[in-house]
Amino acid sequence: VHRDGPDNLLSEFDIGYGDVDAAFDAAPHVFQESLWQHRGGGHSMECRGGIAEYDTASDQLTYWCSTQTPHAALRTLVDMLGRDESDTRVVTPDIGGGFGPKLVFYPEDVTLCIAAMFLGRPVKWIEDRREHFVATTQERDQYWEIEVACDEDGKLLGIRGEIVHDHGAYTGRGINLAANSAETLTMGYVVPTCRMNVKVALTNKIPTTPVRGAGHPQATFAMERLRLGPTLHPNITYKRSNRLPNNLGFQ
């Protein structure tokens, strides 16, 4: 995707606990499931937009925008423009929904401010719905290969597998989506051992960022699918932990 990179692998890491290989070696039953969790998005009633105004006399820059994170947007803006926070304001009025994609600081945000400073007059931009579908960040697009080990009674002994996360062409919020999916896989169940290998891949698609759960729903779907999948042991049982919120793997 990017010529200056050796490949399209943005990041690779393992998340887990316990002796997973020993659990699988000793398990009388091992079952496997392949999952693809396709892309989706947070399609708010109001698309992204902003108005930038620059006062040449006072060197005051004001940016009204539909961000969910005005303080983070301010820090990013002053860093990119080389300005002081005392001379820059980011104002967020009521916005028509956010759901995660409006956490991201987009190129349009800084472009509007640069245009206002260059022209010396207010500049306004509103994203239309077609632009939203091809320019605003999306979520999911994960490929899971996952195995579960259980004993003769269907009791879970361990889970292991691989997640390949389609990150899109650029990174908007780091690798938190893929990490969250792996970290929250075991959820409220007793799973003695777990290890997930996570690969974050760059592709020529729209970047993926948090949308309604930020990776957690993917983990929930995978865990419950393991329980209900047709390839699994008909007597497999999940034991809910009575130790929440502590001492339960990642929880």
Where are these regions (language model features)?
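Structural alpha/beta core scaffold segments of enzyme domains
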Residues: 1-251
